[in-house]
């Protein structure tokens, strides 16, 4: 959908196009037999800045996020968060991880990024969870993790990635592959 030369005081997409898209989706989704509820959406949030926060307060905040599936790993024996991964402003989805560092010399582990090409979202998510990498999934619809395959990724396979960092993987459904 394109809104060409909107008039009036408001001209941003969230104010002009979003209401129209909302109306379209409210009619199209039931036709496609897709329920409109939060259960079908992969939840995500933007990582805040935990640096300078007492580690117990930061880990409590992470464990009590709305999604309740974000894992918190503390590295070091200090009382205050001095660094974090992923960085402030990064998007993290369900099943993700935030690593809090409390000492300058706390180890920052890296992993060799896997080639996700052809993998299902479920397989990619399992690998990322095992390796403490945040997976940002594009193209996933209705939480259907099995019937799709990865076609691209933001971090090249074989490159070193710091644990806690994020990789964006785009998926398409098997019907679209043919």
Report the location of each language-model feature:
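Ligand-recognition elements built from short beta-strands and adjacent flexible loops
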Residues: 1-178
């Amino acid at each position: 959908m394109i809104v060409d030369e909107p008039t009036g005081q408001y001209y941003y997409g969230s104010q002009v196009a979003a209401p129209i898209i909302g109306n379209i989706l409210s009619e199209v989704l039931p036709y496609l037999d897709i329920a409109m509820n939060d259960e079908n959406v992969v939840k995500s949030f933007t990582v805040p800045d935990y640096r300078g926060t007492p580690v117990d307060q930061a880990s409590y905040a992470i464990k009590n996020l709305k999604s309740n599936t974000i894992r918190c790993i503390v590295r070091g024996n200090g009382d205050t968060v001095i660094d974090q991964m992923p960085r402030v402003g990064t998007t993290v989805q369900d099943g993700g991880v935030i690593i809090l560092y409390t000492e300058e010399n706390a180890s920052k582990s890296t992993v060799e990024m896997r080639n996700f090409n052809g993998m299902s979202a479920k397989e990619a998510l399992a690998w990322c969870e095992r390796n403490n990498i945040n997976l940002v999934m594009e193209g996933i619809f209705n939480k259907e993790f099995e019937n799709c395959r990865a076609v691209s990724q933001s971090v090249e396979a074989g490159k070193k990635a710091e644990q806690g960092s994020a990789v964006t993987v785009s998926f398409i459904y098997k019907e679209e592959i043919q």
